Amino acid sequence: MGKIIGIDLGTTNSCVAVLDGGKARVIENAEGDRTTPSIIAFTEDETLVGQPAKRQAVTNPTNTFFAIKRLIGRRFKDDEVQRDVNIMPFKIIQADNGDAWVESRGKKMAPPQVSAEVLKKMKKTAEDFLGEEVTEAVITVPAYFNDAQRQATKDAGRIAGLDVKRIINEPTAAALAYGIDKKQGDNIVAVYDLGGGTFDISIIEIDNNDGDQTFEVLATNGDTHLGGEDFDNRLINYLADEFKKEQGLDLRNDPLAMQRLKEAAEKAKIELSSTNQTEVNLPYITADATGPKHLVVKVTRAKLESLVEDLIQRSLEPLKVALADADLSVSDINEVILVGGQTRMPKVQEAVTNFFGKEPRKDVNPDEAVAVGAAVQAGVLAGDVKDVLLLDVTPLSLGIETMGSVMTKLIEKNTTIPTKASQVFSTADDNQSAVTIHVLQGERKQASANKSLGQFNLEGIEPAPRGMPQIEVTFDIDADGILHVSAKDKKTGKEQKITIKASSGLSDEEVAQMVRDAEAHADEDKKFEELAQARNQADGLVHATKKQVEEAGDALGSDDKAKIEAAIAEVEKAVKGNDKEAIDTATQSLIEASAKLVEIAQAKAQGAQSSAQGSSAEKTADDVVDAEFEEVKDDKK
């Protein structure tokens, strides 16, 4: 059986790890980096992922996608999506089913389809390291992801050719990474996870009992639209406003300028974690009738902190809720772990320290801990790690809509999963022959204020006065946090079941089509690579042949020379096209036409060898020097 890999599919960066000799190991990608930017670019010829995509973003902003995780499993009309529509350089559109999709070069794509490109890169990275095919993975998601977002993440895995064995919450994975080597005593750990696009807080109890470890999540909370991208956007808007004040031009209307501004803002934010002041200097950022314009703005750490102060405060509210849900106070927390790149900001660390009254641990790598934890969970599923039990929770309450548009909860938030709950309901009207089961996720009493996960009908109920029929509704949450619902008429035994797909989401047919597209792309990519190799080989041969023609000089007859030059022209023409066979044929013809050059080169080499031997014999004879000796007599002294 092949290895199960652990993947942290992040908003800004992704990371892959695997159990290697009993230890979780983060794998370096083809560029030699331990994390890969979650950036995907579509050019005319190919799909770029990671650093290569990031490098060309400035020149291709409308086809370069980043922070796609913020759109996954979301509706176009969601407030969070609408906030991003106006600031992203790429096009976010409404799909036919109401989901948020993106568009590149006239092609509409679902976020799972785009995220699948990052997962494919992670899969390939692991395969290159292991030297074998990888088909199974554990993928992490923010703890506060709802059912639709979890489903969409699984879909992305399927499109990438991966069987997703488990979806695991990011803070839980980080706690696994932290606690796996610490076998002494029991600990209550708070994991504060502020990543590129999402924020989670989880309170986790780690019990150690005779070498066996139990990781039990006591409570979780968060905000799936709060992260480093929001911090970047505050700085981007500040820089754009400063430029507008000075030059009277709004850079927000120029995607190219905004992409440069985004890169500069991200760099400045990172620099301000270790220095008190930096300068954002972008020459030729734009131009008007009077000529080119340059952006030069000094930014202090204090200024950045004032721009994002409310975002940091926003992250503290879920901490209070999580502690209350776990029925704990701040003093009950033994350790605080920081996860996610944004936690490197000193002001964030200061806020967390002040809240918990203790310094967070510094021995956990905020960029890699989640992938390491996913690899540990993969080891548990594969049977390679025996003494670890993970008890995760559902982040939001689940229930159905009942009379008066009220949400009636069947499973409360922070219930340990997997779990099952049943409740008996009845009809609202006399002789009602069908009921609609409307499944909801959230904490509000009013049904419409919660997230609708889907609905289905149970039909064929026997006519009876209202309140008489007994309809048993059962909610069953699996270990991935994905919900299965059934409704049963207890009198007739009629039953209707569904696995909740978001009221939108991708159908099985759509996912299957995307898998086929991805496979077709793999063939396309292979063909493109082969074409590039053929072109390189042809170019190299043309260069070498021209050099040989020059070196042959008069030794090459005019007929042969004309033949070679004609063959070179054919190769140069073929290289400009996209027909690999034509390039190969032209290359072969040039090799055959250059046979005379090979003969001349060999003759020259033999001539050089024999002249070298002749000169060495002469040199031996010449080494005998004629000389006259004079007798020196003592009296000459």
From Swiss-Prot:
PROSITE patterns: HSP70_1, HSP70_2, HSP70_3. The keyword tRNA-binding does not apply. Coiled coil: none annotated. Residues 604-617 have a biased composition (Low complexity). Residues 604-637 are annotated as: Disordered. InterPro entries: ATPase_NBD, Chaperone_DnaK, Heat_shock_70_CS, HSP70_C_sf, HSP70_peptide-bd_sf, Hsp_70_fam. This is Chaperone protein DnaK. The lineage of its organism: Bacteria, Pseudomonadati, Pseudomonadota, Gammaproteobacteria, Alteromonadales. The gene is dnaK.
